[in-house]
């Protein structure tokens, strides 16, 4: 169960505004109006978030740059889960227009391209709006108003977003209602509006005098338009262009005003000068300019306090033994169900011996980068080992998976070609297509890649139909599809055959981060490529669609496969597996490789021997897979719900809780019983979608798994 919270703030005025030419008009506020809109916002939250959300919305109302309100009204209404419609966010792009005239020309061109014959009329109507709280509905073909033609317009209500573009990045991308991130709110509203089939397009200008970026949206597409109005102008409004019968338009209005919608896949706002209110706290709990301390320590203390007040501060637990099933956490003996040491190789005697020998032979550190004095024999031999293990010609070692993803993505965005002259105006030279639940390291790498002539389009999670449409519409000469192999929160697997088929059809490169698949997927633990290769050889045990045509093994290989040593291999570091020319390109151009000290020989040697151990002891992989399937089956048998869509083949098992307070309570209850299972809640996952994230290891016994199920049955009231 969730609750819809709405805030409206207004100031009383003695007379109404008029149109810019001084005359009263059909598109302006009536002279009978007795108040001026200051601010409005809404959220859909779980019960545990109501009080904090109300406080944030009230703060926003009283600190808005539109002025001091006389009246602030906050309402709370219950919304049943089955009443909520879940939809994906529109695909996004930005037009860097430099003048108001340029912005208006761009809007007109976009509308004409979308088949809107009344583009100029719609834009003129938009620029004449003053004080209308809702949106004006205009017929896309005739320009006539299709709503009730009053001063209120159509109010789009009952909406929110989950603000999740990747599981581990969600916290970084979160923002309270008080911050009013215009881009995220606008994209949420536009996505809801465009979801109704009667809506052809939407135009929007914010009424905030300090915010000059507006947008136009058409069929599945959201385009930010910079400098849509002069700085300081109070002009603002919305126009929806619609087609349909009177009954269809009435249904559209009812949907816009009454249907509860949560939009998924809203990304982090673009980093420009117009993405946030001035003097308001940002997503990290920043302090208004008037309160910022002059010294760093005080600034940090204030920011931490703001972060803690939102319930977002974290404190790392101290582990004092190896990450084995039975370990010591914060001084207590604990049964560990949260480690990525999936195969138990971090404590394998052969792996430890290899690290020890390398430490003695090479020393503790390398003293240089790979291109200076840090390229040891163990580095090159381990790269060959990883390349052979994954079936590639070459591999390039990096210090961490985060570094590997960031360096690879930023490097692929060099020497970007210009779009052909036949492409639409402002087409970027490179477009990156990113799954909405990708890991933070991919998201940050894409941010670095899109600082130049590159853009990103975020597609709904594993939605290959949406991806295909986006690729078909893309005129960029360079395309790149980026996805996790195994998604770190839900434990589901990327549809690699479909991704590769689309990439070949549309001339796109592919990068897959197989951090959680390396050592865990496939009959010998070689990862996602082997997993899907196995799927064509046997019908059982693979998450493939019935009848899906699987290509041969070589066609399953992405251009770049990122593998990490810090999870199933029990060591640290990562590698980008690829062709030899691509590897040499990375060694010469990837800044994370060129300017970083090479990995410690002990870790690299441990990685090499871990791979050999997997090949020598394949039963470890099989035992991990058996444990994962057994625990999933036991949880389901006892009525403990798993997150929809999670795979049976990965060691990541997300247990659905929903309410954030329940997740904290159950996680603490497990801790009291000697288990370590973290509760994952907002902002790492969407509000009201809290989970317990369980991971299995090959070294867990069946008794370990059964004890966890018993504890969960005691703590979860609806389990059997």
From Swiss-Prot:
Keyword Acetylation: no
InterPro entries linked: Aminotransferase_I/II_large, AON_synthase_class-II, BioW, PyrdxlP-dep_Trfase, PyrdxlP-dep_Trfase_major, PyrdxlP-dep_Trfase_small
Top-level taxonomic group: Bacteria
Region (Disordered): 1-39
GO molecular function, one term: pyridoxal phosphate binding
UniProt binding sites for substrate: 314, 439, 684
Pathway of action: Metabolic intermediate metabolism; pimeloyl-CoA biosynthesis; pimeloyl-CoA from pimelate: step 1/1; Cofactor biosynthesis; biotin biosynthesis
Any one of the GO BP annotations: biotin biosynthetic process
EC number per UniProt: 6.2.1.14, 2.3.1.47
Record's keyword terms, sorted: ATP-binding, Biotin biosynthesis, Ligase, Magnesium, Multifunctional enzyme, Nucleotide-binding, Pyridoxal phosphate, Transferase
A Pfam family per the record: BioW
PANTHER family cross-referenced by the UniProt entry: CLASS II AMINOTRANSFERASE/8-AMINO-7-OXONONANOATE SYNTHASE
Listed name of the protein: Biotin biosynthesis bifunctional protein BioWF
Organism expressing this protein natively: Corynebacterium kroppenstedtii (strain DSM 44385 / JCM 11950 / CIP 105744 / CCUG 35717)
GN (gene name): bioWF
């Amino acid at each position: 169960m969730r609750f819809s919270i709405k805030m409206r703030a207004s100031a009383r005025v003695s007379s109404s505004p008029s149109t810019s030419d001084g005359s009263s008009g059909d598109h302006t506020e009536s002279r009978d109006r007795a108040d001026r809109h200051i601010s409005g916002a809404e959220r859909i939250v779980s019960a545990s978030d109501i009080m904090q959300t109300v406080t944030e919305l009230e703060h926003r109302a009283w600190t808005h740059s539109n002025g001091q309100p006389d009246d602030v009204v906050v309402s709370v209404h219950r919304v049943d889960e089955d009443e909520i419609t879940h939809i994906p966010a529109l695909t996004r792009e930005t037009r860097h227009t430099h003048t108001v005239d340029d912005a208006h020309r761009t809007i007109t061109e976009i509308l004409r391209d979308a088949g809107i014959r009344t583009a100029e009329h719609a834009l003129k109507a938009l620029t004449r709006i003053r004080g209308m709280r809702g949106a004006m509905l205009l017929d896309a073909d005739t320009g006539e108003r299709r709503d009730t033609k009053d001063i209120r317009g159509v109010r789009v209500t009952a909406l929110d977003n989950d603000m999740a573009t990747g599981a581990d990045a969600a916290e970084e991308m979160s923002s309270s209602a008080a911050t009013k991130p215009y881009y995220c709110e606008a994209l949420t509203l536009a996505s809801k509006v465009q979801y109704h089939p009667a809506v052809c397009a939407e135009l929007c200008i914010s009424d905030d005098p300090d915010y000059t970026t507006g947008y136009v949206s058409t069929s599945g597409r959201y385009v930010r338009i910079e400098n849509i109005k002069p700085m300081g102008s109070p002009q603002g409004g919305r126009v929806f262009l619609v087609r349909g019968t009177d009954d269809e338009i009435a249904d559209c209005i009812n949907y816009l005003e009454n249907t509860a919608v949560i939009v998924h896949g809203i990304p982090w706002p673009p980093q420009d000068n117009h993405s946030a209110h001035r003097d308001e706290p940002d997503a990290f709990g920043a302090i208004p300019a008037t309160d910022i301390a002059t010294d760093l320590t005080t600034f940090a203390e204030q920011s931490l306090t703001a972060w803690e007040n939102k319930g977002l501060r974290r404190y790392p637990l101290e582990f004092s033994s190896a990450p084995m099933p039975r370990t010591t956490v914060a001084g207590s003996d604990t049964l560990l169900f949260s480690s990525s040491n999936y195969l138990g190789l971090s404590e394998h005697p052969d792996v430890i011996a290899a690290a020890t020998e390398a430490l003695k032979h090479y020393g503790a550190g390398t003293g240089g980068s790979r291109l200076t004095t840090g390229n040891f024999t163990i580095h090159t031999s381990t790269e060959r080992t990883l390349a052979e293990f994954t079936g590639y010609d070459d591999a390039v070692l990096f210090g961490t998976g985060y570094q590997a993803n960031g360096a690879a993505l930023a490097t692929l965005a060099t020497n970007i070609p210009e779009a052909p002259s036949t492409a639409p105006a402002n087409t970027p030279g490179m477009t990156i297509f990113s799954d909405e639940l990708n890991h933070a390291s991919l998201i940050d790498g894409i941010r670095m890649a899109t600082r130049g002539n590159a853009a990103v389009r975020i597609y709904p999670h594993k939605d290959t139909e949406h991806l295909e449409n986006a690729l078909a519409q893309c005129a960029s000469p360079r395309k790149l599809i980026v996805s996790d192999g195994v998604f770190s929160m839900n434990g589901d697997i990327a549809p690699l055959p479909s991704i590769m088929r689309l990439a070949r059809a549309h001339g796109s490169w592919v990068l897959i981060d197989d951090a959680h698949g390396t050592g865990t997927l496939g009959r010998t633990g070689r990862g996602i490529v082997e997993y899907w290769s196995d799927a064509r050889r046997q019908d059982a045990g693979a998450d493939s669609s019935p009848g899906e045509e699987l290509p041969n093994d070589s066609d399953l290989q992405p251009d770049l496969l990122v593998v990490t040593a810090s999870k199933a291999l029990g060591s640290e570091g990562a590698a980008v597996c690829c062709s030899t020319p691509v590897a040499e390109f990375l060694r010469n151009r990837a800044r994370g490789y060129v300017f970083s000290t090479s990995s410690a020989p002990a870790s690299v040697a441990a990685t090499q021997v871990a791979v050999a151990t997997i090949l020598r002891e394949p039963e470890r992989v099989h035992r991990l897979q058996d444990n994962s399937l057994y625990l999933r089956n036991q949880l389901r048998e006892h009525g403990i719900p798993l997150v929809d869509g999670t795979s049976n083949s990965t060691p990541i098992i997300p247990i659905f809780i929903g309410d954030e307070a329940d997740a904290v309570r159950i996680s603490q209850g497990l801790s009291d019983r000697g288990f370590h299972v973290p509760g994952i809640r907002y902002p790492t996952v969407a509000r009201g979608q809290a989970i317990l994230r369980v991971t299995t290891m090959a070294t867990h016994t069946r008794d370990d798994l059964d004890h966890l199920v018993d504890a969960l049955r005691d703590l979860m009231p609806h389990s059997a």
